[in-house]
């Protein structure tokens, strides 16, 4: 079994972002890194969206950026402009390709499917993996979405519909979220 200076459990957005930052900031010089990830291949499986509050290293992975957004309710339609903090979406496939192509150039970075493949005996391990008991609160957030393409141009691709509450609330809070990537393609959740 091999030993490593750094071990990142999970090769998703957070884990790969950490590995990438270590690599580009020369923190892996003369160090070894193991990334534990169960997936067999990286493919486009997610779209990550966020408010851009500062510069980041993934501008080349951004598939769309918006300065305008709307919130709809039974009381009306509100359009807001936010040029200081645009809303951006990142294509996970571009993100994975960028990071993995950079990390694959470093022979000190290795990928594993299981933590059992790594020797952690006689080691000091800083455990940043959350292991606490979950608080069983009644608050639950769940998103389900699909990317659609329409035969006609029906979306205003300059405006994100951030929250559309014009749907049955069924004693809970429900809303639609529409990210128009073009005039005829959008992610709807």
What role is predicted for each listed range?
Residues 17-76, 93-94, 144, 148:
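N-terminal FAD cofactor-binding segment of flavoenzymes
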Residues 72, 81, 179:
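Residue-level detector of conserved, well-ordered beta-strand and adjacent loop positions
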Residues 1-14, 34-36:
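Beta1/beta-strand and adjacent pyrophosphate-binding region of the FAD-binding site
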Residues 75-79, 185-188:
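Short, basic/glycine-rich phosphate-binding loops at helix/coil junctions
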Residues 79-101, 128-130:
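Short beta-strand to alpha-helix junction loop
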């Amino acid at each position: 079994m091999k030993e490593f200076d750094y071990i990142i459990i999970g090769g998703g957005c957070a884990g790969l972002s950490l590995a990438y930052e270590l690599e580009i900031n020369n923190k892996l010089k003369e160090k070894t890194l193991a990334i534990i990830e169960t997936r067999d291949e990286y493919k486009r499986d997610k779209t990550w969206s966020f408010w851009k509050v500062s510069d980041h290293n993934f501008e080349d992975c951004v598939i769309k950026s918006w300065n305008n957004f709307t919130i709809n309710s039974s009381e009306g339609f509100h359009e807001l402009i936010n040029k200081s903090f645009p809303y951006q979406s990142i294509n996970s496939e571009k993100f994975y390709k960028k990071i993995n192509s950079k990390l694959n150039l470093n022979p000190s970075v290795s990928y594993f499917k299981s933590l059992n493949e790594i020797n952690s005996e006689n080691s000091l391990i800083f455990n940043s993996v959350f292991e606490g008991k979950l608080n069983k609160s009644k608050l639950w957030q769940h998103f389900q979405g699909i990317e659609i393409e329409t035969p006609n141009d029906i979306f205003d691709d300059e405006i994100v519909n951030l929250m559309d509450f014009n749907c049955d609330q069924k004693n809970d809070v429900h809303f639609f979220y529409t990210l128009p990537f073009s005039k005829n393609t959008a992610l709807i959740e």
